[in-house]
Every structure is written in structure tokens, then in C-alpha cells.
Amino acid sequence: MKARNQVRFVITIVTIVFAGEVCFASGGDFEYWSTAGASLDINRDWGCTFEEELRFKDGGGELYYHHSDLGFVYKGLASWIDLGVNFRKVYSKNSAGEWVQEDRPHFNATLKGKVFGLDVSNRSRLEYRDRENEKDLWRYRNKLTVKLPVELTRLKLQPYVAEEAFFNLDDEGFNRNRLYSGFSVNVSKKVKGDIYYLWQTTESNGKWEDVSVIGTGLKFYF
């Protein structure tokens, strides 16, 4: 791993955190989610990732969620599987409008390959939710992503679809589902972008509630 890449990686993380805090300090019918991240190859088998995400509700005007996520990925087992361990710090508003914290370590196994010429990945995630003023719990998430083998316009937009199911490992069980449709784009050799529409349904008190989300993302590679 080159020292110059290490320095760039740290600078990128600091920039992402600073940008997130600026948005956090600023003060509807849909939500807007904004994600920025960085990925660093430590060596041939190991990588390090960092991510910041902000979520706005009430037409994209009120910040209600923010997380920072740091993780390590092992890619040396086989070309078709990545293993990861992460720690996520979450700040979100509760029903009273108060900010509460959550510590969320999570473990990931991502299977990837080609099926009928399509790029397909399936990520299994097991996370422990250590929540402030609420019961702690384990949750399992499974996300299936399919990328189409086409590139649209001069920007080389690649369309994809995805579905993610959430299962609380208690009496509640399956309680959330997300459907994605979007485009990924290579902004440059080391920067990738993402824009998507997400439809989320969540079970609450025996009723299913839905929300529409427009999301954008940027990821830097080192």
C-alpha cells in the first residue's frame, strides 16, 4: 500500500465528515438520502471502507438520520465472495423529535458473479443494534442487486435494480422491504456515482407504511 494513497484516503474521510457536519448544522412528500464514501485497498486481500449517510424527510427539508460506518473487507477467500466486518454509529430522531444514538456492529458476506450475462450480487448482513432507550436486538438483512450489461448515454450510465429485506431476529420477524431502481456512473477512474429511486415499506403496529426516496451517492477509490 502506497503512503500517498494512505494520505489521500485519510483526507477524503476528513472531507466527508466535515461535509456531513455542515449539512447536519443546516436547518413533503418524499425523502432524500445522500451518501459519500471511500474505499482503500490495503493489500491484495484486504480493503478498508468508510461511509457517511444523511437522510432528509418532509420533502427533503428536515434532517432526521445520520450514520458513519467504518469497515474492513477480506477478498482473499475466493473471487466470488467478500467478507466484511463493520462498525456503524447512527444518530436519528425518535417520535418525539429528539436525537438518539445507536451503535451497530455488523458482519457481511457478499456473493457475486454473472448470471445470464448479468452482474449479480447477494449481500447477507447480520447486525447488532445497541439502541439508546430501546431494546437491543439482532437483525438480518439480505440485499440482491442485478446490474444490466448496458451503458446509456455518453456518461455510460449502467442501470440496476435491487431488493433488500429486513428481519428482526425476535418475535417481530420480517418488517421492512426496500426496492431500488437506479443508475451507476463512472465519474472518473477513481470516482463512482449513483442515483436511484427507492420504495420502502415498513411494518409498524400491525400496519404497513411506505415512503418514496430519491438517493444519490459518491464513492472514491484508492
Where in the sequence are the language-model features?
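Membrane-embedded beta-strand positions of outer-membrane beta-barrel proteins
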Residues: 50-52, 83-85, 109, 122-124, ...
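Start-of-domain marker
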Residues: 25-75, 82
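Transmembrane beta-strands of outer-membrane beta-barrel pores
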Residues: 52-58, 76, 87-93, 113-115, ...
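Outer-membrane beta-barrel proteins
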Residues: 42-44, 74-78, 111-117, 144-152, ...
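Residues that define the transmembrane beta-barrel architecture of outer-membrane proteins
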Residues: 30-32, 64-66, 101-105, 136-140, ...
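Membrane-embedded beta-strands of outer-membrane beta-barrel proteins
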Residues: 36, 70, 107-109, 142-146, ...
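Repeated loop/turn-to-beta-strand initiation elements of outer-membrane beta-barrel proteins
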Residues: 45-50, 79-83, 116-120, 152-157, ...
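Outer-membrane beta-barrel "beta-signal"
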Residues: 109, 210-222
